C-alpha cells in the first residue's frame, strides 16, 4: 500500500511539472506573439497601409476592423507555434488578401469558407475563433479573393502538408499601395520601405525557427539574403507563374519529407 501511494505521488508530481512547463511555454509563446503584434505598429510613412493598427476609412466595414485583423493574425500564429516545418515568405500584403484578412497570402473568402471547392477550409487557417470579414459589403459582396492566396494554400495542402506545419509571411509585412489608385491597389515596396520591414521579418523568423524557408520571388529572396538566412527561391505564382510555382514547391516539399 505504501509503495502504491508513493508511486501515485511521484506520478502526480510528474504530471504537475509537465503541466506547469506547458503552461509556461504557452505563456511565453503568447507573449512573443503579442510583442510581435506591437512591433507591427512601426510601419513606415507614405503610401503604406497597416491593417492591424489602421482603419481603411473607404473600405473597412467599421472602426473595429484593425482589432479583428489582430485577432485573426494572433489565432493564425498561435495555431502554428512549435509545429512549423516550412516557412514561406512572400513580397508584401495585397489588397485582396491580408489587407482585409489580416493574414499574409490569405483572403477573406478563405476565412469565410468560400474556397472549399479549392480544398481550403477556414479551419486550415485557424479554429480557435470565428473569422469575421472586415471589408464593407458594397465593394465585394462575397469578400475579397486573392489568386496568390488560393494557389499557395491549395498547393501546400494538396501536397499533404498539415496546415499547422507551414506558416506564410511577407518580407515587407504591410500593404504598399499606389497613391494615385488608392487603397485597392498594389505596388512593390521601395528599398527604403523594405529596410523598415527587416526588423519585423527577423522577429518573425525567430518566432518560427525552421530549417526549410522558401522565398516567393526576388523581393523575398533579397530580404532573406540580407539576413544571411538559407532559403529556397521559387517562382512567385502571380503574373503567370502558377505552373512553375507548383512544380518548384513540390520539389521543395519532396525534399522535406
Each language-model region and where it sits:
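Alpha-helix/helix-capping structural signal
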Residues: 218-219
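A polyanion-binding, active-site-adjacent surface
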Residues: 29-212, 222, 227, 232
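Short, flexible loop segments at boundaries between secondary-structure elements
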Residues: 229-255
Amino acid at each position: 500500500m505504501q509503495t502504491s501511494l508513493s508511486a501515485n505521488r511521484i506520478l502526480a508530481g510528474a504530471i504537475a511539472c509537465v503541466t506547469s512547463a506547458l503552461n509556461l511555454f504557452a505563456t511565453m509563446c503568447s507573449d512573443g506573439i503579442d510583442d510581435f503584434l506591437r512591433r507591427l505598429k512601426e510601419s513606415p510613412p507614405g503610401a503604406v497601409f497597416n491593417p492591424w493598427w489602421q482603419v481603411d476609412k473607404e473600405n473597412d466595414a467599421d472602426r473595429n476592423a484593425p482589432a479583428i485583423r489582430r485577432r485573426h493574425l494572433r489565432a493564425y500564429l498561435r495555431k502554428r507555434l512549435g509545429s512549423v516545418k516550412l516557412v514561406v515568405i512572400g513580397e508584401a500584403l495585397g489588397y485582396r488578401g491580408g489587407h482585409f484578412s489580416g493574414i499574409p497570402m490569405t483572403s477573406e473568402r478563405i476565412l469565410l469558407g468560400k474556397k472549399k471547392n479549392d480544398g481550403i477550409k477556414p479551419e486550415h487557417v485557424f479554429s480557435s475563433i470565428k473569422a469575421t470579414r472586415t471589408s464593407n459589403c458594397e465593394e465585394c459582396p462575397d469578400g475579397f479573393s486573392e489568386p496568390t492566396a488560393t494557389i499557395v494554400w491549395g498547393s501546400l495542402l494538396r501536397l499533404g502538408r498539415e496546415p499547422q506545419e507551414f506558416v506564410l509571411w511577407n518580407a515587407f509585412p504591410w500593404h504598399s499601395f499606389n497613391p494615385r489608385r488608392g487603397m485597392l491597389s498594389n505596388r512593390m515596396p521601395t528599398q527604403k520601405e523594405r529596410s523598415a520591414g527587416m526588423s519585423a521579418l527577423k522577429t518573425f523568423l525567430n518566432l518560427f525557427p525552421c530549417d526549410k524557408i522558401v522565398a516567393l520571388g526576388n523581393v523575398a529572396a533579397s530580404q532573406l539574403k540580407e539576413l544571411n538566412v538559407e532559403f529556397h527561391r521559387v517562382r512567385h505564382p502571380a503574373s503567370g507563374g502558377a505552373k512553375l510555382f507548383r512544380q518548384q514547391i513540390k520539389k521543395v516539399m519532396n525534399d522535406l519529407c
